[in-house]
Each structure stands twice: as structure tokens, then as C-alpha cells.
């Protein structure tokens, strides 16, 4: 069992990583006997894990209600968020309740925002079931829903009480979802840890076949890196922005193509290549390093070009609504070397459009 602590003073919390955690009531600490829980999950995951998690919580003496949400990024919306509030109020649940997010990034982000908002804030626990949510979205307290004009535009920074990563969940993950998660894994190597990127080049095949020790190390290393960044910059005023490599481009793809048509990791993968091409055009990054990124993403089964039907010009309106924009100016996360990156502003729109076009025509 691996245990990592996100160090945030009185709001610090553990990330527990192991197989078989859904069999152990202690996995869901700080929940105690007599407490009330609203378990939030999705239509796909409910048949797989709802009864199991409910059973282990009830074994610990916890009173469990549940709400099942529709699947897909398009349902990470204010309308679906309202169904969670309605379920909480109908029971009813008070300020002493705990929300448990059992699912991928959509369930985790939406449940976290519900917890941040319900009666001005209640406790919640992240139980991520996809690789993407295990290595990224469940850690760090970013919670949100989407708006038709932009992804994650309505939300809050709100930390969970704990994160429970049961590696056995990956056995039921569709291959496309596994690949999507690997995009965020590869991101950590590009922005922060060149040695980890090298390890991924050597061990990607083991990850694709869900080799236990390789996957446990991979998730642990990603969570360590994320925990270090969040501890240093919880509210994304500096260092934490680096975790958005590829996201400014990727969010544009998701919004333009319709949420759910491109998985988040797929859009981020193409966006990371666009960021690398932008850095190349600025003379800050070598084409050989870009090719290493492209090769690893391709081996993972991820796209390295944007949608053919989306023109370079179509990216700009979305990118100019990005949350990192300051004084109307885009701020891009650009790689300087494998394992090193920076936030860059003042890049001309023409250069960015040319970098996007490089990826459209490749």
C-alpha cells in the first residue's frame, strides 16, 4: 500500500493507493460509524462498484444514500449538479454529511463542486476509478462544471478529506479511457520529471497491459508530483499552472467539437503537441524532443493532431476565454526540455495559429 500526503496545513489529506481497498472499511477514513454519506456515481459504474462500496461503508456503520448520474463530459453541467442538490435535500442531508465521489473525472469534479456549494461546504472523499482521475483530477481540489462557452468555467478550489485509489478499478477500464489517462501521465514527465518520461518510454507496454507493479509506481509518481505542486501553489497563482500543459489547446478542441466527442486526455494529447510546436517556433524546444513526445503519445494510442474539421482559427475564441488569460492575453504552458516547462505570455496569435496548423497538416 502506498500513502502520499497532500500537505496543506489543517486541510492536508492522504492519497491511499493499493489493490483491494474497496474490501476494507478503513480505506474510507475519516468516515465513522453513525455518519451519513451521499454516494455519487455514474450509470456505467453503478453496476460495477456501487453495491460493493455501499456494503463496505455499511459494514463500518455508515448510513449510505446514493445518486446515479448519466455518463459523459456533456453531463458535467449545472443541470446535472442540481440533481445532486435535490437528492441531498430530499433525504435530507445536513452540514455533517459526506459526499463520496465514486467515478472518473466528471463524477469527481461535479461531486466536489456540489460539496463545496451545498450548505456552504460539506466534506467529500474522492474515489477515482479511471487512470486519468487517479493520477490527476482527484488530487488538488479543483472542482467544476462546464458551460457551453467553456470547460470548467464554474467551480471552486475545494480539497477532499481523502483520496482512495483502488488499482483494481483499472481492470474494468475501456482501452480508450486507459489511453486518455496516459496523456495526463505523460504530461507529468514533460513538464516536471525527465527521468519519469524516460521510464515511461521504457515501460509503456507494461502500463498498457495493466502490469501491477508498473501501474502502482506510475500512479504513485504522478500523485507525488501533483501533491508537491499543489502544496506549493494550491490556487494556481504560479507553479501549478504548469499542470495545464496542452489544456489551453485541448479545452478548445473539447468545446468546439462538443463535450464527450473527444475524451479529455485525447484533446490534451493533441494540445501538448501543439504546445511543443509553439515552443519550437519560439526557438525554445527542439524538434527531436517534440518527436519523442509524438512517439510516446502514438504508442499510447493517442491523437497527435487536432480534428481535421476544426480550423486553426476556430481555436482562438476558446483559447482567449481560458482561465489563465490575464488582461486579455493568452498565457501558454510551453516545454523548454523534456522535464522542464514554463508559463509564457505575449506569444503572437499568428505564431500560435501556425503551430496549430503544423499539427493539422501533419
Swiss-Prot record:
For whether the record's keyword set contains NAD, the answer is yes
GO terms under biological process: amino acid biosynthetic process; aromatic amino acid family biosynthetic process; chorismate biosynthetic process
Copy the pathway line from the protein's UniProt record.
Answer: Metabolic intermediate biosynthesis; chorismate biosynthesis; chorismate from D-erythrose 4-phosphate and phosphoenolpyruvate: step 2/7
Location of this chain's protein in the cell: Cytoplasm
Molecular function terms from GO: 3-dehydroquinate synthase activity; metal ion binding; nucleotide binding
Instruction: Provide this UniProt record's keywords sorted from A to Z.
Output: Amino-acid biosynthesis, Aromatic amino acid biosynthesis, Cobalt, Cytoplasm, Lyase, Metal-binding, NAD, Nucleotide-binding, Zinc
What's the short name of a Pfam family annotated to this entry? Answer: DHQ_synthase
Task: Quote the record's binding site residues for Zn(2+).
Answer: 184, 247, 264
The UniProt record lists the keyword RNA-binding: no
Q: CDD domains in the record, alphabetically?
A: DHQS
Function according to Swiss-Prot or TrEMBL: Catalyzes the conversion of 3-deoxy-D-arabino-heptulosonate 7-phosphate (DAHP) to dehydroquinate (DHQ).
Q: Which family does the similarity line name?
A: Belongs to the sugar phosphate cyclases superfamily. Dehydroquinate synthase family.
Q: Which HAMAP family match?
A: DHQ_synthase (MF_00110)
Protein's recorded name: 3-dehydroquinate synthase
Name the source organism: Shigella flexneri
> What is this protein's gene name?
aroB
